[in-house]
């Protein structure tokens, strides 16, 4: 279920301040954030945001087609290493 249109998209205030400061700065650097719940706005395009996945910060370069999605969608929290090998083959 999506967010109500009358509320509008959500972005953490501290992240928005960092993005605005970064767009005004001449030298761009990586913005670290723990806010996986924030929606990507159009003024985030072209910035690199390091999103925390519970273990480390994953750098996410924001592109045009990411607008409207959440930051957490681009930093997976679980690492899939495949299923365990079938022991039946090795016993024969």
From Swiss-Prot:
Give the UniProt entry's GO cellular component terms.
Answer: cytoplasm; small ribosomal subunit
Annotated protein name in UniProt:
Small ribosomal subunit protein uS19
Q: Which UniProt keywords apply?
A: Ribonucleoprotein, Ribosomal protein, RNA-binding, rRNA-binding
Q: Which organism is it from?
A: Lactococcus lactis subsp. cremoris (strain MG1363)
Question: GO terms for molecular function, please?
Answer: rRNA binding; structural constituent of ribosome
| Record-level GO BP terms | ribosomal small subunit assembly; translation
Its lineage opens with: Bacteria, Bacillati, Bacillota, Bacilli, Lactobacillales
Which cysteine pairs make disulfide bonds? none
Q: List the HAMAP family hit by this protein, alphabetically.
A: Ribosomal_uS19
Task: Give the source's domain of life in one word.
Answer: Bacteria
């Amino acid at each position: 279920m999506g967010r109500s249109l009358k509320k509008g998209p959500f972005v953490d205030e501290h992240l928005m301040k960092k993005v605005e400061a970064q767009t005004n700065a001449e030298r761009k650097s990586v913005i670290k954030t723990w806010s996986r719940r924030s929606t990507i706005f159009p003024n985030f395009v072209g910035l690199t945001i390091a999103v925390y996945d519970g273990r480390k910060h994953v750098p996410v370069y924001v592109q045009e087609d990411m607008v409207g999605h959440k930051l957490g969608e681009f930093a997976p929290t679980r690492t899939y290493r495949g299923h365990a090998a079938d022991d039946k083959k090795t016993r024969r």
